[in-house]
Amino acid sequence: MKKILIALFIFFQFSCFSQKVSLNDFIQKNVNLKSLDSLRNEFQLEYNARQSEIDAYFSLNPSKKRRFYEGSVLKEVYSIINGEPMYLRTFNDGSAKTIKANRLYSSSNGGTLGLNIQGQNMKVGVWDGGIARESHVDFGGRVYTIDATTTEDHATHVMGTILAQGTRDSRLRGIAFQALGFSLDWNNDLGEMTTTLVDRNTLVSNHSYGLNSDGAPIWNAGAYTSSARSVDALVFTSEFYLPFFAAGNERNNNPQWNPADSGYDLINGKNSAKNVVTVGAVNSVTNYTGPTSVVMSSFSSWGPTDDGRIKPDVVAKGVNVRSTIASGDTDSGIQQGTSMACPAAAGVGLLLQQHYMNLNQDQPMLAATLKGLILHTADEAGFADGPDYQFGWGLINAEKAANVLSSRGQTSVVKELILQNNATYTTTVQVGSTKPLVASISWTDRAPASNTVNNGTIDLQTLMLVNDLDVRITKGSEVYFPWTLDPANPSFAATNSSENFRDNFEKIEIALPEQGVYTISIKHKRTLVGGNQKFSLIVTGDSVVETLNNTSFSENDFKVYPNPANNVLNVISTTVSIESYEIYDVLGRIVRNKTINSTNQFDISELKTGVYFIKLFSGYNETVKRFIKN
């Protein structure tokens, strides 16, 4: 009897293995509430200190403006650095069709996938320079004000891009037009973000603002600051909560900010955090036929960050976007900027979480899975294959992302796992066609040590990645590596001949794979801080099925009977408690997945006659048994 010790990884059993519980109960059980509360207290102290410094500055400089408009751009003092005010600013200077979100809707609303995913029962937090106009008719009573402050056009436009109904004018329909929205101002955003997941079950938030570059020290360009670290700590602790940040509009400034880098190295602060989705802006795309269909806006800020990470992450339409405004309950207006692209992306995040929850007993995917899914399925953009510092991983494609979730276990793999220290996770996939094989890993990384963030150094290149995971694919003697970019030459094309040591998302693409079995391996560099690292694995292709491996138990730990079976299959074990199971057909496709009942009996009456495999799960372990259905 041969036993194989599993010390490499823990398999997160997808929510389809769990009893159906409410989202709130799930969050209460699976999120570290004590750590979140500690962060809230920390951020509140920082906010109080910052406000005291601002009050002191304006008592000495009463003629200065604390909050004002410059054209259509709202600016407000956020902090005092070396005696000078630093300002936040809004980034405003046919979204659903550009990113194919409309394909997820009901057929009566233009959907083509038969899903009816429109944001029903989903909630989004929108932080902005003011609040949205609650009473706008296109909000239909679905917007709630949390902070009592000024109603603003920008906040109303952003909120509308996410969830406006468009009942009177279809051009105003938001991406997730049946979702609920919470409107808050940006002054204490970090503190409020620590409570939004637990108090309001908000899985996605939008932040269409950032540091105003006018007058800001040049070292801020591309800098990973303490505010970015705070956001990363928050997302790491929250696990299921994913903020979307606008990349910024600094590329068309006159005079230009950071002119030495020719439009690159502009994204900074919270917008440069590792664990968020940073969104750039492009023109409308009516029919994507290839990379040249995606045209960059004149203003969208480009990466890299100072440590060379890929930013923006993705792009969406941000030019000439019509949406709701605050001047009246029926008013609308056209704005442009990464402020308008970001809420389109956030809306897609809501739709994909909704689709996943519909498939998985109302339980959400990890933030890392959602981010990885969006980046994995983005349409190619830019002058060369792979990512770049202008478009990131490309144009969001909600349809493609939804199809990956729908086909999990059939032509795609989506897994949430834990890599243990000094371990390697390995799986194999059977490829049945010559269309591209794509594998990605995504993880929510820990915040770096506080003394490593940038406090005034131009182009500080210290790596901010804490736990560095690496993915590679092998077939025989062939080895395939993920895409990487060279921050020293930001305009150069991406390469795929070495490991990526900067980003917490990695992607391998094999354009013309030979048919056969490929091995996907994930390992890590150095010692994993915390002893392990959760990560998400996404694999897609035209005909990709994960090979079943019997790797966890002794062969005699379980017995399956009768075999062949008619309507009921029984499993008996005297040594291990079975928690859940999956049934696969001979092509490796999942045809059933459920939790175990108290009798360890499985109803197989609906299965067609043939050969099947049942994968049994217990804690960290799994095993596969073959059976025949009469």
Language-model features: locations:
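C-terminal tail/sorting-segment detector
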Residues: 18, 609-630
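Subtilisin-like serine protease catalytic core
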Residues: 19-21, 95-192, 199-204, 214, ...
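Substrate-binding/access-modulating region of protease and related hydrolase catalytic domains
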Residues: 21-25, 165-169, 182-275, 306-309, ...
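N-terminal domain-start motif of subtilase-like serine proteases
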Residues: 32-37, 44-126, 146-151, 227, ...
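Catalytic-core environment of secreted peptidases
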Residues: 127-139, 282-343
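Hydrolase catalytic cores
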Residues: 315-384
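Secreted peptidase-domain scaffold signal
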Residues: 394-467, 537-546
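Residue-level detector of functionally pivotal "anchor" positions at catalytic/ligand-binding pockets or at interdomain
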Residues: 540-561, 567, 574
